[in-house]
């Protein structure tokens, strides 16, 4: 995580008045730089100087090191050389991307007046400059700075603390590159899972929250955190700031937000306003996400299941990579959103499954629509760039092509007999954009378009008569230059003479070095004026060439000015219907996800799951979606297995399966595949099985794999225990829990005891659907007294002293782990294997299993409290009062909240 310095309020466009003390010691240009930099501490300042952005002092040293560019110097300040480096304006986005990726933020300072205007104000006048944009990780819009397949979220976190203890958090997250705006409220216990789901690129918090020791570790999990002053998170002015941003009189037209949600939402739009400096990116009204609307998945579970990234940090090999058959960037982003937040509403899931099912059944429609979508642009991001003045001609063309594609998709969808509800909604969205706009854009825009509007040449010939006239004058002058070159070659006798052009010299005459002396000698030197000598060429100008260059420049400037006016006019028309265009873009994304999941289902032989509100969990012939694809690439089959955690006829809660078997037999794969099948079902996807029935899962927990956390001073075993504690403390009846090898990181009996107690707690207290894999075979004895516990094992076969893994899960329990056979396969020396067998034989003679069976008979269940626990004294009144005081954060409380807290504390005092 990168902890950032606060972003200051940007200065006005006009440079502040010079400071007298600085004026005596620095040049006017450096004086201007220092004043602008002082207003933007904590950011690297890109200071525009002609065709370069230049950086000075510490900024230059940081940029030079990060970008690998030359560090030089320019002038002196207080007797010391001023470090300086620069990047070309035309390559600025590439350098910005590298700086942002390295955790830096950048203030972009542009020239806000023409140099000629500065000169007219006086010889010593400096060109006015102002910061036009603050580039931060969460406020990017350019394609070159963004991952096309991922959202780029800015997250605002607001906290409220109660005198009775317990935190509540308001969260608002915005992607200004797509205009998405979401809000929710959660408890402190839900915060980590919610942050992991949103996966923001940048978070903004109050100074107090930034420095909070309790939340420090949670915040450190985020890529970048920026602290802001408390006024940005002022709940009293939150609704007014939101109304101002959306230009509405009241919040009635927006979502009904809680005070905390409104506080976070207003902080987010305030930060967007500050970073865009005068621009006002259009956003969708904040959509409120109800608590519990999505499956809660904590960060450890997301990592263990490798949902979007493998444990090595790669997309390839993740579940997202395995199921992503989308053909558009927007579709890929939507699929990632759904995978991050599986639904918990069965009817909503059914609507998604209906859409996928329609395209599973109609392969021709599926492939036709996918073919159209392949050429569809990313309209949401094109609109975002145009709205903040960073768009180009290709963005306008993208909107044109998007409207044309909408017509093509509508025509094909119209051939469906009975489109499902989700597809019907898409069809309605695709009818909204104006077809007249597409027609005008088609008339106005040329076939070949530049990336940057200032390059010109993007308006079609014949669209604007005044522009055609300016271009003809410019081009006619260029023909004069061509004829001039032929005449100069004849006059000088230098057949290789050329007239060329660059941005520094303008037009110039160029000859090889061997002919240079001829042009610099009489009588030709009266016509040809020397400009530049290079290694192999010498360059000249003439008064005639200077005159024609001025005519070309004037005509070219007029042509470019007219083109830019046309661009702004077309851009304004597009932004007038931005809501309609954005709705169509969302429709494309929905269609892309539905058709891609249908293709996945057909290609990989997936089936439609049954998802309901029961506690059922029955999967027949289930497969791991990622492992199966990997095996298929190698020409190997995947062994499917069933799993049924549904409540037995006489039971109300789901079952707990205890899975035993050797290493390498496939226990972890079996655990993960069932969790992934459930997750796929609840995002609205078909699943890898022959049949699947899933009762809604509200929380998914996974404790699989082993890794330490050296940064936090945690051993592998400690990490395991922390994650297990979270499961035992948070899992409810609707949760799905998968646990692998709990207790393996400590002494045998310690580990066995922990695993034993954990099973009892899951069975008696949590009462959730659970898969528990272990090498402690003694635990199988618990099935005799835990009615909802079921023993299962992974089948193996011994053959000629070796073990063959069959990867079949069957009822029963393993009597051994075959660890020595696995060690032999791994290549341990024969002497070690022989000795290990000898030691194992002696240990097995002690019959640990008999001891475990006796314990199972003698020990009471976990749910029965011990006498010591029953007789434990409750906390004293003084302790309760002290805990309540510790929970208070005065810096975050309004006067009214502080008064309420004081009364609440007084109420806790014993009555006199």
UniProtKB/Swiss-Prot annotation:
Q: Where is the signal peptide?
A: none
Keyword Ubl conjugation recorded:
no
Task: State where ATP binds.
Answer: 661-668
Q: Which CDD domains match?
A: ABC_MutS1
Which Pfam family is one of those matched by this entry? Answer: MutS_I
* GO BP: any one term: mismatch repair
Acetylation recorded as keyword:
no
- Classification via InterPro entries: DNA_mismatch_repair_MutS, DNA_mismatch_repair_MutS-lik_N, DNA_mismatch_repair_MutS/MSH, DNA_mismatch_repair_MutS_C, DNA_mismatch_repair_MutS_clamp, DNA_mismatch_repair_MutS_core, DNA_mismatch_repair_MutS_N, DNA_mismatch_repair_MutS_sf
The record's annotation in PROSITE patterns points to: DNA_MISMATCH_REPAIR_2
Q: Which GO terms describe its molecular function?
A: ATP binding; ATP-dependent DNA damage sensor activity; damaged DNA binding; mismatched DNA binding
- Give me the Gene Ontology terms describing cellular component: cytosol
What are the entry keywords? Answer: ATP-binding, DNA damage, DNA repair, DNA-binding, Nucleotide-binding
Biological function: This protein is involved in the repair of mismatches in DNA. It is possible that it carries out the mismatch recognition step. This protein has a weak ATPase activity.
Annotated family: Belongs to the DNA mismatch repair MutS family.
* Classification via NCBIfam families: mutS1, PRK05399.1
Q: What is this protein called?
A: DNA mismatch repair protein MutS
In its UniProt entry, the species of origin is given as: Bradyrhizobium diazoefficiens (strain JCM 10833 / BCRC 13528 / IAM 13628 / NBRC 14792 / USDA 110)
Q: List the gene name.
A: mutS
């Amino acid at each position: 995580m990168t902890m950032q310095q606060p972003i200051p309020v940007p200065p006005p466009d006009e440079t502040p008045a010079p400071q007298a003390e600085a004026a005596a010691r620095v040049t006017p240009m450096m004086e201007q730089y220092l004043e602008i930099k002082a207003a933007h501490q904590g950011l690297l300042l890109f200071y525009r100087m002609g065709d370069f952005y230049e950086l000075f002092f510490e900024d230059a040293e940081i940029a030079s090191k990060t970008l690998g560019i030359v560090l030089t110097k320019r002038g002196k300040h207080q007797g010391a050389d001023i470090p300086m480096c620069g990047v070309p304006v035309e390559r600025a986005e590439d350098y910005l991307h590298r700086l942002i990726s390295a955790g830096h933020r950048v203030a972009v300072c542009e020239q806000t007046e023409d140099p000629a205007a500065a000169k007219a104000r006086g010889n010593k006048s400096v060109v006015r400059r102002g910061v036009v944009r603050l580039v931060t990780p969460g406020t990017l819009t350019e394609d070159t700075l963004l991952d096309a397949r991922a959202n780029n979220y800015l997250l605002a976190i607001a906290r409220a603390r109660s005198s009775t203890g317990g935190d509540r958090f308001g969260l608002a997250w915005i992607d200004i590159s797509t205009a998405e705006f979401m809000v929710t409220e959660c408890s402190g216990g839900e915060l980590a899972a919610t942050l992991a789901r949103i996966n923001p690129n940048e978070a903004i918090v109050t100074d107090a929250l930034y420095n909070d020791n309790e939340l420090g570790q949670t915040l450190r999990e985020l890529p970048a955190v920026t602290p802001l002053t408390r006024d940005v998170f002022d709940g009293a002015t939150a609704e007014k700031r939101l109304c101002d941003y959306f230009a509405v009189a009241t919040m009635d037209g927006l979502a009904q937000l809680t005070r905390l949600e409104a506080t976070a939402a207003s902080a987010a739009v305030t930060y967007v306003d500050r970073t865009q400096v005068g621009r006002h990116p259009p956003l969708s009204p904040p959509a409120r996400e109800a608590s519990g609307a999505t499956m809660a998945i904590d960060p450890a579970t997301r990592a263990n299941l490798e949902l979007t990234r493998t444990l090595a940090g790669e997309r390839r090999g993740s579940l997202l990579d395995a199921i992503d058959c989308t053909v558009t960037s927007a579709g890929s982003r939507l699929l990632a959103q759904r995978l991050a937040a599986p639904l918990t509403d069965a009817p909503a899931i059914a609507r998604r499954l209906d859409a996928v099912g329609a395209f599973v059944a109609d392969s021709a429609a599926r492939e036709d629509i996918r073919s159209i979508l392949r050429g569809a642009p990313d309209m949401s991001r094109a609109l975002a760039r145009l709205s903040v003045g960073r768009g180009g001609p290709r963005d306008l063309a993208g909107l044109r092509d998007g409207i044309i594609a909408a017509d093509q998709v509508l025509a094909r969808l119209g051939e469906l007999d009975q489109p499902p509800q989700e597809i019907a909604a898409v069809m309605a969205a695709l009818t909204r954009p104006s077809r007249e706009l597409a027609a005008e854009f088609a008339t106005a825009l040329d076939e070949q378009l530049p990336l940057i509007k200032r390059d010109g040449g993007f308006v079609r010939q014949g669209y604007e008569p005044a522009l055609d006239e300016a271009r003809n004058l410019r081009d006619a002058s260029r023909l004069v230059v061509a004829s001039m070159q032929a005449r100069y070659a004849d006059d000088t006798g230098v057949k290789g003479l050329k007239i060329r052009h660059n941005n520094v010299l303008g037009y110039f005459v160029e000859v090889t070095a061997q002919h240079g002396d001829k042009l610099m000698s009489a009588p030709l030197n009266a016509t040809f004026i020397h400009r530049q000598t290079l290694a192999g060429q010498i360059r000249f100008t003439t008064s005639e060439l200077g005159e024609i260059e001025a005519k070309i420049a004037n005509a070219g400037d007029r042509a470019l000015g007219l083109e830019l006016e046309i661009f702004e006019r077309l851009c304004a028309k597009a932004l007038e219907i931005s809501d309609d265009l954005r709705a169509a873009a969302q429709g494309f994304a929905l269609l892309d996800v539905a058709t891609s999941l249908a293709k996945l289902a057909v290609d990989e032989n997936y089936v439609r799951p049954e998802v309901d509100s029961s506690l059922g969990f029955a999967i027949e012939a289930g497969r791991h979606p990622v492992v199966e694809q990997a095996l298929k690439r190698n020409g190997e089959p995947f062994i499917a297995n069933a799993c049924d955690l549904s409540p037995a006829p006489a039971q109300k809660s789901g079952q707990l399966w205890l899975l035993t078997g050797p290493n390498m037999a496939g226990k972890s794969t079996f655990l993960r595949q069932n969790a992934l099948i459930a997750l796929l079902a609840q995002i609205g996807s078909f699943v890898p099985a022959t049949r699947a029935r899933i009762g809604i899962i509200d929380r998914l927990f996974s404790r699989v794999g082993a890794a330490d956390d050296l940064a936090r001073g945690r051993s592998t075993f400690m990490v395991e225990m922390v994650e297990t504690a979270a499961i035992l403390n948070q899992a409810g009846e609707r949760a799905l829990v998968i646990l692998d090898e709990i207790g393996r990181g400590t002494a045998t009996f310690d580990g066995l005891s922990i695993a034993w107690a954990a099973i009892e707690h899951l069975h008696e207290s949590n009462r959730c659907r659970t898969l528990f894999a272990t090498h402690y075979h003694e635990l199988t004895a618990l099935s005799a007294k835990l009615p909802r516990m079921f023993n299962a094992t992974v089948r193996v076969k011994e053959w000629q002293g070796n073990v063959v893994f069959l990867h079949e899960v069957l009822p029963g329990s393993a009597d051994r782990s075959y660890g020595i056979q696995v060690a032999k396969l791994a290549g341990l020396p024969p002497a070690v294997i022989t000795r290990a067998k000898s030691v194992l034989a002696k240990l097995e003679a002690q019959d640990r299993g008999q001891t475990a069976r006796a314990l199972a008979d003698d020990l009471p269940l976990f749910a029965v409290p011990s006498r010591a626990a029953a007789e434990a004294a409750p906390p004293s009144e003084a302790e309760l009062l002290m805990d309540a005081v510790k929970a208070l954060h005065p810096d975050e409380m309004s006067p009214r909240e502080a008064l309420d807290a004081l009364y609440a504390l007084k109420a806790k005092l014993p009555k006199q």
